[in-house]
Amino acid sequence: MKTETPRSVKTGPLISSTGQVLSRSVAFSFTLDPTLEQRILFAKCAGARRVAFNHHLGRVKESLYVRSSEKAYCGAALTPGLSWSKISFINEFNAWKNGQLESSPVNDDATRGLSWRGEIPESVFECASSDAAQALANWDGSKKGQRAGAVVGFPRFAAKGRATPSFRLRNRTREGITQSIRFTDSAHLRLPKIGVVKVLGPTRQIRRMLNRGRFHVYSATLTQRGGRWTVALTGVAAVFHPAQRSSNQRHQLPVGVDRGIKSLAVCADSDGQLLVAFEGVRELRHAEQHLIRAQKALARTTRGSKGYESARARLKKRHRSVALTRKHLLHQVSRYLVKRCSTLVVEDLNVAGMVRNRHLAKSISDAAMGELRRQIEYKAPWYGVEVVVASRFFASSKTCSGCGAVKSMLSLSERLYVCEYCDLTIDRDLNAAVNLARWTPDTPIVVST
């Protein structure tokens, strides 16, 4: 379907002004504290992003419909197809919003183009066009079997009120020119055509990396969730320095991390010693109680009323509170492990398959097993920790950590592992953690004994 060849791009890693090789993808996220005028401008930018994104989807959808109805036509009689490349989308929308096309909107004063286009940064429209092109490419590749992962459907229109308000700004830089996205001090971030916005939270790490040429910002993505605006600064960073151990005493033996529903993580070493068990579920359940009350309050209102919108806004805040509670717990667990262990062994769980169990789907999703592994894997290089991923088919829970016998059946209700051969009685999560700590790539996969 694509008819244009994308322009050639430079290959190889980026070299900073200080000679640093920037090849590691990194993102820093901060909460913003914008003024009322900036909040209004943010909302306008998010709306402009929806306009550009929906514009391209509408064009492509109409073109596909017309061409599908012309299947019996000859090649010369067919309606020409549209190019789905990012550059063609950007050029077409620029011409459309500037009033250079016949399809451009007509204003009340008979002028063509979007009358409010001057209020919005150009990169908002460009990034929205790139997002639309990428979404269509994902759908096309999935349909042809050229894209790995789950099946991707045709992109959905970004409806106001349903789509999360978000937009992206590019960091335009040239040699000798100040970057358009930069920190003015420890608590303020300058964004192109928006100005200086107050940032909440510590920014020392990213500012030091920027000053030393160890990080380059590509773009800033602003998103509104639960009534708060956040910014994610995405770019490339220099490779890590040789791993430096922290001053804390590290556990030298391999540590197995068993992720579960009852406990977020149970950690034990290869000698069978329990190091730590992270519960965390109680705090999450407490936060969900407020969420349940907000959901009931929303159910009592009339859809479309002011009370409905107020209750809906309160519900969004509660959802954000639950999400932040879960995120905080996971960061506590992952940070503790990478700072106090030298080798971590985690299991390659099929989380997508586990959530298909409708009785356990919510508990498995709350435990965020995949997210915990992701955090451990990306934080491990910071502290020089080795992460070993055990085979998905290794029966860590069914294997006896005392004699190595493997049970044929072990229900989830059995919280204690009782071995029939050596009479070992041990908590099932602790037993699994010990087995993981002892796992090696040469460990045989035994179904049962």
Q: Where are these predicted regions, by residue range?
A:
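Nucleic-acid substrate recognition interfaces
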Residues: 1-449
